[in-house]
UniProtKB/Swiss-Prot annotation:
Single GO biological process annotation from the record: methionyl-tRNA aminoacylation
Reactions catalysed according to its record: tRNA(Met) + L-methionine + ATP = L-methionyl-tRNA(Met) + AMP + diphosphate
PANTHER family assigned to the protein according to its UniProt record, in alphabetical order: METHIONINE--TRNA LIGASE, METHIONINE--TRNA LIGASE, CYTOPLASMIC
Cofactor dependence: Zn(2+)
Top-rank taxon: Bacteria
Organism: Methylococcus capsulatus (strain ATCC 33009 / NCIMB 11132 / Bath)
Span of the annotated motif 'KMSKS' region: 330-334
One cellular-component annotation, GO: cytosol
EC number per UniProt: 6.1.1.10
Keyword Chaperone included in the entry's annotation: no
Designated name of the protein: Methionine--tRNA ligase
Textual note on the cofactor: Binds 1 zinc ion per subunit.
Length: 694
């Protein structure tokens, strides 16, 4: 075995504004399995997490309940920990981002970034609730969709037609908090200059720290150009005040990942561990983040950029997983498939049934996984009970009934028939299964383990110990003793391989077999001669389909959202739209200044790709009496062939600019934040090339 590795593992921090549901549990079960496997291998592996406790939703929910935010997050922390414990998620530390440890690290990192010139303040314009006297996040503004005119749509996207937009695009907007019409108000915000970290991030995202599909996804952001990141919010806000900026608070997505450091700092202080050994720039420890693919932007761009430029180490790997569907569809309250962890446990379902089923579906990619409730019942009953548990239940009773629970037998019968060949096969599979666990291909591990279980069951079916037990001669008793001993050794090996997934069942098996806690290395040994076992007790029951029906019924709710409570914010939407906040109007200029700009109608005579350029298209523009060549940064939004023949507006008297790819003789006008959201301006019908725009 290789020397022990020093490993720190995190899962994304659940938001302290709601219950844990089965979708959340995909990630925590995935992480817990991986951590348990590493610990079984003898590695020094620490697993930390925390509640994500800051932000406007926390503040407003606490206000609605008539309690302080601190009281709310303390209660939710207890609920989350209860649910995780119920599903056997075993953290080394489960903490809160609302801690002095996280506050100190946030202030430290902010100060280091500021010292390096990566923090900038600037005025922005946002919607403000004049009744509550607070700036409103996108999801706390509703109005009429500017495209399909659906009523009561959120401030960042329409759930009817799917259009995304800025809150200021809404028709007749109103505050979800007070119902008042919001007004635009200017405020100074603090920005992290993420764009200046682009070259580092391009290298880091291609370094092997990400899954291939994750790295490819991030390429889209690089092509669009990285925007500076707004890291501040205005009072009133529940969070950490920015040092030297009274009334300004760190945005929740700045201190949330720093919560990993805060939780680990708390663990270090309690156990006497060296924090710097894990987080310093040249650390030899391994750092792994398990996350959902919806927060990839924050963890794979914002977070490593912050760490790198504040003098800390970056993650060894980031493992992103897909979303959970139930019966092939999004979880639904009306269909009863938006199932909370608490409800699952209260309905009496075994948490290890779900751990096993998720393991059957999980792999090392970002693919979504589906919880088919019918398949869930069938697979657990067939695999766990019908194959695995069945092995012990069909043989253990004979050992205690006829042999006083003793397993002191040879592995070969008097007539020379060897029965230990299957033991070698199972032992030799340890490294293959180990590789699957390490790469998070749990579905492959399960497939292999169940193939081995099938072979063991074939062995038992061929030997028929229940038939042998009916015969009372000495040969039959000896044969029965060997068959049972072999079978229980095989059962023990299968238990080792399943232990990361089924820790409580493995504990029960350890008690039944009277053995210490199983490690991965134990796959190379057998139960010793003369070993005694306890009486067999039933290890697991089958799922009754009626239990699942009752679970669904218990979770069936109306689709109508709770009044005044917006749906949880989408980190993806926030990442894509935060730069769409209305920018302040530029400095006033005179009419004489504006008159200097010669705007003309131009027809795009030709458009083509520019070899070696990620963002540019080469446009040949017809101005009526002459043609111009312009290099325009619109490649991410337009295919060249779709532009040919189109009319647009250009700045005709802009000084020619010599570029790497040629001379650009003007500028076309477009709106939008960039990336795929670039909108080329077009004149109304009747305009002709060369006409002056007045």
């Amino acid at each position: 075995m290789t020397s022990p590795r020093k490993i720190l593992v995190t899962s994304a921090l659940p938001y302290a504004n709601g219950p844990i549901h089965l979708g959340h549990l995909v990630e925590y079960i995935q992480t817990d399995i991986w951590v348990r496997f590493q610990k079984m291998r003898g590695h020094d592996c620490r697993y930390v997490c925390a509640d994500d406790t800051h932000g406007t939703p926390i503040m407003l929910r606490a206000e609605k309940e008539g309690i302080s935010p601190e009281e709310l997050i303390a209660r939710v922390h207890g609920e989350h920990l209860r649910d995780f414990t119920g599903f056997h998620i075993e953290f080394d530390n489960y903490y809160s981002t609302h801690s002095e440890e996280t506050r100190a690290h946030a202030a430290d990192i902010y100060g280091r970034l500021k010292d390096r010139g990566l923090i900038e303040s600037r005025a922005i314009e946002q919607y403000f609730d004049p009744v509550k006297e607070m700036f409103l996040p996108d999801r706390f503004i509703k109005g009429e969709c500017p495209k399909c005119h659906a009523k009561d749509q959120y401030g960042d996207s329409c759930e009817v037609c799917g259009t995304t937009y800025s809150p200021t695009d809404l028709i007749n907007p109103y505050s979800v908090v007070s119902g008042a019409a919001p007004v635009r108000r200017e405020s100074v915000h603090y920005f992290f200059k993420l764009g200046e970290c682009a070259e580092f991030l391009k290298d880091w995202t291609r370094s092997g720290a990400l899954q291939t599909e994750a790295a490819n996804k991030l390429n889209e952001w690089f092509e669009a150009g990285l925007s500076d990141w707004d890291i501040s919010r205005d009072a009133p806000y529940f969070g950490f005040e920015i040092p030297d900026a009274p009334g300004k608070y760190f945005y929740v997505w700045l201190d949330a990942p720093i919560g990993y450091m805060g939780s680990f700092q708390n663990l270090c202080d309690r156990l006497g561990l060296d924090f710097a050994e894990y987080w310093k720039k040249d650390s030899e420890a391994e750092l792994y983040h398990f996350i959902g693919k919806d927060i990839l932007y924050f963890h794979a761009l914002f977070w490593p950029a912050m760490l790198e430029h504040s003098g800390f180490r970056t993650p060894t790997r980031i493992f992103a997983h897909g979303f959970l569907t139930v019966n092939g569809e999004k979880m639904s309250k009306s269909r009863g498939t938006f199932i909370t962890a608490q409800s699952y446990l209260e309905q009496g379902l075994n948490p290890e049934w779900l751990r096993y089923y998720y393991a059957c579906k999980l792999n090392g990619t970002m693919e979504d996984i589906d919880l088919s409730l019918e398949d869930f019942v069938a697979r657990v009953n067939s695999d766990l009970v019908g194959k695995y548990i069945n092995i012990a239940s069909r043989t253990a009773g004979f050992v205690t009934k006829f042999f006083d629970g003793r397993l002191d037998v040879p592995m070969q019968l008097a007539d020379g028939e060897a029965l230990d060949f299957l033991i070698d096969r199972l032992r030799d599979s340890a490294e293959e299964i180990s590789g699957y666990y390490d790469s998070r291909d749990y579905n492959k591990a399960i497939r292999k383990i169940m193939e081995l279980a099938d072979e063991v069951n074939i062995f038992v079916n061929e030997k028929k110990p229940w038939e042998i037990a009916k015969r009372d001669d000495s040969y039959s008793r000896g044969y029965l003793r060997v068959v049972c001993a072999i079978t229980l050794n095989l059962f023990r090996l299968l238990t080792i391989y399943l232990k990361p997934i089924l820790p409580r069942l493995a504990e029960a098996v350890e008690g039944f077999l009277k053995i210490p806690s199983l490690t991965w290395q134990d796959a190379q040994t057998l139960l010793p001669q003369g070993h005694t076992i306890n009486d067999y007790q039933h290890l697991m029951t089958r799922i009754d389909p009626k239990q699942v029906d009752a679970l669904v019924e218990a979770n069936r709710q109306s689709l109508q959202a709770t009044a005044g409570q917006p749906e949880p914010h989408s980190q993806v939407r926030h990442a894509e739209h935060q730069q769409r906040q209305v920018q302040p109007i530029a400095e006033t200029i005179s009419i004489d200044d504006f008159a200097k700009v010669d705007l003309r109608i131009a027809r795009i005579a030709n458009a083509e790709h520019v070899e070696g350029a990620d963002k540019l298209l080469k446009l040949t523009l017809d101005l009526g009496g002459e043609t111009r060549t312009v290099f325009a940064g619109i490649k991410s939004a337009y295919a060249p062939e779709t532009l040919i023949g189109r009319l647009t507006v250009m700045v005709a008297n802009l000084a020619p600019r010599k570029m790497k790819f040629g001379l650009s003789e003007g500028m076309v006008l477009a709106a939008g934040p960039g990336g795929g959201d670039i909108f080329l301006l077009s004149p109304d019908e009747g305009a002709q090339p060369g006409m002056k725009v007045k």
